[in-house]
């Protein structure tokens, strides 16, 4: 009998599909990268998710985020993503956490139940804390490096953090993880030199914030406004999703 996953099963096989159905993946931050991770994984057959993000959909998200439409502006990203995932697969299990991950609230997450962690966070402190928690719990993790201020999606690749170059975020992560004794970390990063945003536009975006009421990360509070396009973070998210699937089923 045909199912919505029949064509995927042609490639992966039944054992792998069963593995994915029984897997629980935590995606930290449901933005330009994380949204496409969720989209690809639910369409591939992953059976359970934890979505972690304290932000709401903003009008400026419409240029790149899969959950962003005129109708979803002002809604929590986790709730919008959950609704979309259930429309794709009504049997998927989705837990949402409308909060931002930090070391002090790590105890609030069921890490012991996660089979894989996706780090799509864009702040160094939270990224490092998440990586350290994953290493402590021996949970596979993949981290997204900088996807903003870039135009060439073909420059992204999968590598160990200590094999990366060019990316400013990866440079900081290498330094901080080395201090903490982390030996390896799978990441997706780009060798493209970051493009400097048009200065007067960045100032305008920050000073004329149109974020929804109650938004936790308003433009007026950001040190820098990164430029973005639809065809870059989406590719990063799809690359990450592919790595998650391949890792989960590699011994099937």
Question: Which sequence ranges carry the predicted segments?
Answer:
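N-terminal charged helix/coil linker that caps or initiates catalytic domains
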Residues: 1-26
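Hydrophobic/small residue at the entry helix of a nucleotide-binding pocket
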Residues: 33-34
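Short gly/pro/ser/thr-enriched loop/turn and capping motifs at secondary-structure boundaries
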Residues: 57-60, 148-153
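Conserved N-terminal Rossmann-fold NAD(P)-binding element of oxidoreductases
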Residues: 27-29, 52
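Glycine-rich phosphate/adenylate-binding loop
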Residues: 2, 21, 109-116, 121-126, ...
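Glycine-rich phosphate-binding loop and adjoining beta1-alpha1-beta2 segment
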Residues: 46, 51-89
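Conserved SAM/SAH-binding loop
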Residues: 98-106
């Amino acid at each position: 009998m045909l199912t919505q996953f029949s064509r995927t099963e042609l490639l992966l096989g039944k054992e792998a599909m069963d593995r994915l159905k029984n897997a629980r993946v935590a995606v930290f931050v449901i933005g330009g990268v994380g949204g496409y991770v969720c989209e690809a994984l639910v369409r591939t057959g992953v059976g359970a998710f934890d979505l972690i993000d304290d932000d709401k959909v903003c009008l400026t998200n419409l240029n790149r985020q899969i959950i962003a439409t005129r109708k979803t502006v002002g809604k929590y990203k986790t709730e919008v993503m959950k609704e979309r995932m259930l429309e794709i697969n009504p049997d998927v299990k989705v837990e949402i956490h409308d909060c931002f991950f930090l070391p002090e609230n790590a105890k609030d997450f069921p890490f012991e139940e996660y089979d894989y962690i996706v780090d799509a966070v864009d702040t160094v402190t939270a990224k490092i804390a998440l990586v350290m928690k994953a290493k402590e719990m021996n949970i596979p993790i993949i981290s997204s490096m900088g996807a903003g201020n870039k135009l060439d999606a073909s420059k992204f690749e999968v590598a160990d953090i200590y094999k990366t170059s060019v990316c400013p975020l990866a440079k900081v992560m290498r330094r901080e993880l080395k201090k903490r004794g982390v030996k390896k970390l799978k990441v997706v990063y780009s060798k493209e030199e970051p493009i400097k945003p048009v200065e007067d536009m960045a100032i305008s975006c920050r000073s004329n914030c149109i974020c929804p009421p109650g938004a936790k990360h308003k433009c007026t509070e950001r040190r820098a406004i990164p430029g973005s396009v639809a065809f870059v973070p989406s590719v990063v998210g799809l690359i990450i999703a592919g790595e998650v699937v391949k890792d989960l089923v590699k011994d099937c």
